[in-house]
């Protein structure tokens, strides 16, 4: 762990409070501001490892929660997990068989970064497009979608694609996002189905 991480107050707070990463606070803040999750919602979390959003989701809903990631996710009581690629039709089918249609899809995933900003941003947008396709396949009409993306040249295209599928779409940068980051969340409510 680098010194940047050890000096990061949000990271240290997350560890102290038992969260797996600082990302927990991003979802908490989004929920407080936009109320995207209801108490009885069934939810799929794409790119769920290490499980920090799953930890938060478990406290926000009494519904079923499924985390999907390429990497294994350590057990969290009351959470179902599926190891696989969200772009794989077999994984999508398994998710739908496990939960049926759901009320919310969240995605805090990011591709492995290469250090080349434009390349990494393009890969993040492509991942966002795949997550949107997944969401459209499993969401109930009226459902919500929350996804992390990165601002850049291709961001408006992803935003427009999401706006075409949902009645209300907003962008939001959380307080827990590091200074200088191009990270932004898209909060999409009321899936057109």
Swiss-Prot record:
GO terms for molecular function: rRNA (uridine-2'-O-)-methyltransferase activity. It catalyses: uridine(2552) in 23S rRNA + S-adenosyl-L-methionine = 2'-O-methyluridine(2552) in 23S rRNA + S-adenosyl-L-homocysteine + H(+). Its EC number is 2.1.1.166. It is an enzyme of class 2 (transferase). It comes from the Archaea. GO terms for cellular component: cytoplasm. Keywords: Cytoplasm, Methyltransferase, rRNA processing, S-adenosyl-L-methionine, Transferase. The active site is at residue 148. Gene3D superfamilies: Vaccinia Virus protein VP39. Pfam families: FtsJ (PF01728). S-adenosyl-L-methionine binds at residues 51, 53, 69, 85, 108. It is found in: Cytoplasm. Transmembrane segments: none annotated. Specifically methylates the uridine in position 2552 of 23S rRNA at the 2'-O position of the ribose in the fully assembled 50S ribosomal subunit. Belongs to the class I-like SAM-binding methyltransferase superfamily. RNA methyltransferase RlmE family. This is Ribosomal RNA large subunit methyltransferase E. It comes from Methanoregula boonei (strain DSM 21154 / JCM 14090 / 6A8).
